[in-house]
């Protein structure tokens, strides 16, 4: 029994040690710890006959045993027990276990503490965080936006960078490290089911960073350095900037803020390159700085009930894949709309105020004169919520000048007014990625959109013109764009807002100013235009924060006459929805002029809010489907037509699903706008230039007018080879076919317009003296933009627009659709064919070959003008590619092009041998054209089809 006390003591020591370990999951059992406990339990230095032995002697004994270099003592037994007065404290001190971490105070010395959702400490370039037990293994939603870009897509200030895939993070402890984990929330199954267990095996989370614990706080929180997380290419911007890499030594913190429910971080991230790739919008491509903003907040758990989406109504989506769904289902995707958790204060009432309204705060930085149109634009949405059963669903409040809170605090939905110099607006919202519930939202306006004369429209490149007109217009071009684009950026419009409306509205303001100045209208009229435009922008961005997507078909609701009838538009706006990109509505002089922009939300907006926010009975999202289907079944009504971003690309067929168009007849609209532009040319210099001023405003106004002419003509060209697209389902009232070929008569009407306004010199016959007044700005310093040519590049810019429209007409995709259309229309019905199209274009573009039969011409008065020669070269090049089979157009189109070139050569050769005395320019041009055609025809015969 003599060993029983030792055995009991040993068990107690081991139990005590295990208890200590339970408080430190990262602790490691060391050999010296085990030895110390065993020594205490078995009494190696103290016999079991002396249970009250001095415990302070043991470390000294241990230390002395471990100190082999200590000098021998004359009284070994006594010294071993007590030691002298000086050596004993030192022995005690050296015997203490070495601290696992440096002292908290030492690690955070000279740092600045930032309280908030996560306690931060900023220490020079370092950012440290305290992560307590309540912050580990919790879900945080992370929004990434470009706070300041480089002026090139997609790195534009204001753009959300999540591309529909906002991250959910967790901090997890793993030994002596804290792992930053991105959770996989896309896949789901019924809780507790075998399928859920299979999912856990099949899909894993991603560990992004492993951060060493630097120290422990007095409260037991782990202190880690977050600098490696954010001072990195975390957003993968380098993937869209080939040749650039993140340069940590050139990157800095732009802003660090903490709030009760969120953390806001902004990094001035610099990307370095060898300088071999030139970027026009930055001064030196060896160092490109992008301000990246990170917003981190906890993902709350609420009683919110998700609502299922319908493809006839335009909401942003939260998409999950549910493996518990029946295998008989078409797919396993579950699509929820994004919306606020709006609940009636009185659920039994047909109309009720909400328990908690959606409150927007106007930031104190908004200029006083603009607060009313912005307030009115936000509150305009209450009309739609009344249809859904709510009074005063939205409130607007003004942030006081002495408000103790900042706009970045997610407890406040703010309408912000900033000066980033980028002319953008966005309505970013924080959305629960598993339910679609909107948790908070902000609207950010950049004040530079009012500085519309800063835009240098005359410097448009072919790429810039392509962006103005929808991007790639051929499938090969589109596929190349997609291949170059990182996968995380593709196909994200349905889940995250990417809005460029304000930059376009800035151009519309510039157009309005140019036209009104040329008409000598009062400044009050321009003020009216500005205030209406500002209100429409506010309505548009608020719509995004409510969950609504773009609707680019909305502008086709009215005829030109009806959209200028204010008795109608005061109730509905000038289109069916404010979620379109609407141009300024300016009509030719002598015609009725209506509102310049929509002054209220439209019928589509009311219907969409009804779908998303009407309280419906049912304990689950699926139980609501019958009532939701009744609402969505109205989609066939004219004012409820819907087409969004993926319907408005350059490759898409619907001519009415485009940006900045207006009216139900794009040919009539283009003719009206061509007249507006033509009326403005003569007086543009005098109207835009005052005595003592330079001529740069006149130059910019000219570029603005020319751009409007090109845009509306391109829009009208989409009738050729176009299709009317409908989202209606089978059985919907007034449902249309999903796809209908544009009537041949309308396609030919479009070609008539283009022959008159694009493939003709007349619209571009400006007075020579006008060109000589179009001088560029002479300032050359940071913040200014120096154009490549101080003189106006007239031939170059006119040809850019002509070639853009021509490229669309004879793109392989347009030709394929026209060719397919012959099968989609009864043979007894009229149809435009590819043979007719190419024959018309050849005759129109080379009309001089037939019309110039006699006469004498000079280089100053040529038979074929310089603008026409440029157009003819562009057409010949594209027809040559087509005839040689170098495009993906149908084989029939290639043979038609071959035959058309053969006939053109015959006509050219006949003219060259005729009586007309051609000028040197025209003769050389035709001789070269004939020779080139010969080469193409010979090559075609050698290579074959």
Model-predicted regions and their roles:
Residues 379-390, 543-544, 548, 584, ...:
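Sec-exported extracytoplasmic/periplasmic mature domains
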Residues 8-24:
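Bacterial N-terminal signal peptides
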Residues 398-418, 532-588:
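The catalytic-center signature of Zn2+-dependent metalloproteases
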Residues 32-366, 375, 384, 388, ...:
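Auxiliary tRNA-acceptor-end handling modules of aminoacyl-tRNA synthetases
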Residues 366-370, 519-538:
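Short pre-active-site segment immediately N-terminal to the catalytic Zn-binding motif
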Residues 1-6:
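Positively charged n-region of N-terminal signal peptides that target proteins for export
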Residues 19-32, 39-40:
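Bacterial Sec-dependent signal peptides at the C-terminal "C-region" and cleavage site
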Residues 517, 525-529, 554-945:
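Conserved catalytic/binding loops enriched for acidic/polar residues
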